[in-house]
Structures are given as C-alpha cells and as structure tokens.
C-alpha cells in the first residue's frame, strides 16, 4: 500500500517523511483547493529525499484554462522536472466538465520529457461520464488519477472507485482521496482494490 500525504510546506514534508509516508503531494493554499507551491519549497522538499508530486495550478476557481495559463503550467512542470520532483499534479477540464484532452496531452508530454509522472487531480470528480474520462486519461498517458468517485468522500464513492479500478486494468493508477484516514484506509482498500491512497494524514 502506498500512502501519499498532502503537504503545504517543507516542515510538513519532513513530518511526512519521518512518519513513513510513501510520497507527498506538495501544494500551497489549500483554502483554494491547492495551488502551485513556491520554487523554493519545491527544491527544499525534494532535497528531503522523499518522492514529491507537485501541484501545478496557477490560480483558484474553475479548472478551465486559457492558452496563457496552459503555457504557465508547462513552464512550471519543466521546473518541477529539473528540480527532481516525481510527478506533476494537474487537472484541466473543458466547458462541459469533460477532460480537456488537448491541454492535458501537452502537459503530459512536457512532464514525460522531463522525467515526471502525471497525476490528474480531483477535477476528475466533476466529470459527468467518469468511465469515458478515465479512458481518455489512459489514452493520453496519465500515470494516475486522484478521485473520491465524485462523492464528498472516498468512502462514499467507493463503489464508483472500485469500478474505475476494474476498468483501469493496470493501465492507470486510480488513487482514492477525500476523507482517507488511518481508521478507514484498510476498509477502503478492501472495497475498491486500490493500492495507492491520498490524504492529509495517513499515519
């Protein structure tokens, strides 16, 4: 079982490492559902020796991005790769809340060029047809997708997550997130068949 802890600063990353987290997701401004952290925090977190996935999101609000904003994210992904991060964490939707395939493809390609994995974050939960959207992420080449199954918590969305894990057939990692705690993670693993889990405290 891989446990990914969501962290908003270097001190939290250090605590996660010392608490035996498998990996961290580094972001800033959780009150806005997470934005790109500072370059200084990215570099300092990577230096702690734990795999660091970095949120790449230039602003709060809707997950529909302009060409200028996509360009900013491409540059941020490149920096993360050069800094030694493990993956970028991104989510781009179109006006109908489907996957923005064109933008996501460009971002995945840039991540791969700089040795980064690619997590599509919980913007996925807004997609009305999750099975179709999962297929698109697989075709694009995303490493993983973070999801609560479209429910307020992963436990409430466990049946949807289980279906997505089944459909994924090992082609993409389906990672439950949303209310995941030490007290429910084993049950959630049993219900969904997932092997990676995301939360603010998982130990």
Question: What is each of the regions a protein language model found here?
Answer:
Residues 1-4:
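Extreme N-terminal starter segment of soluble prokaryotic enzymes
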Residues 6-8, 27-29, 55-57:
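Acidic/polar N-terminal loop/beta-strand segments that form early-domain functional surfaces
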Residues 8-19, 54, 62-79, 102, ...:
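Catalytic cores of alpha/beta
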Residues 22-35, 79-95, 140-157, 180, ...:
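Glycine-rich phosphate-binding active-site loops on the catalytic face of alpha/beta enzymes
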Residues 31-34, 59-68, 93-100, 124-128, ...:
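Short, small-residue-enriched loops and turns at beta-alpha junctions
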Residues 35-104:
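Glycine/small-residue-rich loop that forms an oxyanion/phosphate-binding "nest" at active or ligand-binding sites
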Residues 48-50, 83, 113-114, 168-171:
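Helix C-cap/helix->beta junction micro-motif
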Residues 107, 111-154:
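Histidine/lysine/aspartate-rich catalytic loop segments that bind and position anionic ligands
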